[in-house]
UniProtKB/Swiss-Prot annotation:
Reactions that this protein is recorded to catalyse: ATP-dependent cleavage of peptide bonds with broad specificity
This protein's UniProt keywords: Allosteric enzyme, Cytoplasm, Hydrolase, Metal-binding, Protease, Sodium, Threonine protease
GO biological process: proteolysis involved in protein catabolic process
Enzyme class: hydrolase
Protein name: ATP-dependent protease subunit HslV
Record organism: Pseudothermotoga lettingae (strain ATCC BAA-301 / DSM 14385 / NBRC 107922 / TMO) (Thermotoga lettingae)
Keyword Protease tagged: yes
Record entry for activity regulation: Allosterically activated by HslU binding.
Lineage of the species this protein comes from: Bacteria, Thermotogati, Thermotogota, Thermotogae, Thermotogales
Length: 176
């Protein structure tokens, strides 16, 4: 059976960066956990990080990413590129199955094990099974309302949880 889970969304707007993750972990056709924590602050509280995929793999990548952040003096983009290079070329790391979503006040990045570091044009990004729904909702709210980043994230995650069966409404939110 396959573990399925997660929607993690980040929105950066008007000087605020807000990330949210749902709490559901699904194994096959069974919900195993409702309150998983898939996001956290790292880098002395200046960086938000979330994951989709294997929890053990994500924790290993969080630790490595935090080391890269320290090594590169908090430069999010450089740390992300260096992690992606290691992840792609290291034989052990290459086997890790996770996606990372990281953000600071200025940058939003998705990091994958294939060496990709993607910076969205509009500072809105999501990973996981509910990502398309969360991104669509966030972009619609950004384009048509004056809501702040936190309100956009809350409403978008609620919408994603109503559509994606692998996403629940038990949302954890972090803000910088």
């Amino acid at each position: 059976m396959e573990w399925k889970s997660t929607t993690v969304l980040v929105v950066s707007r008007n000087g605020k960066t807000v990330m949210a993750g749902d709490g559901q972990v699904t194994y096959g056709n069974t919900v195993m956990k409702h309150g998983a924590r898939k996001i956290r602050k790292i880098g002395d509280g200046q960086v938000l990080a979330g994951f989709a995929g294997s929890v053990a793999d994500a924790m290993a990548l969080f630790d490595r990413f935090e080391s890269k952040l320290k090594e590169w003096g908090g430069n999010l983009t450089k740390a992300a590129v260096e992690l992606a290079k290691d992840w792609r070329t290291d034989r052990v790391l290459r086997r890790l199955e996770a996606l990372l979503l990281v953000a600071d006040r200025d940058n939003v990045l998705i990091i994958s094990g294939t060496g990709e570091v993607v910076q969205p044009d509009d500072n809105v990004a999501a990973i996981g099974s509910g990502a398309p729904y969360a991104i669509a909702a966030a972009r619609a709210l950004i384009r048509n309302t004056d809501l702040d980043a936190r309100e956009i994230v809350e409403k978008s995650m609620q919408i994603a949880s109503e559509i994606c069966i692998y996403t629940n409404g038990n949302i954890t939110i972090e803000e910088i």
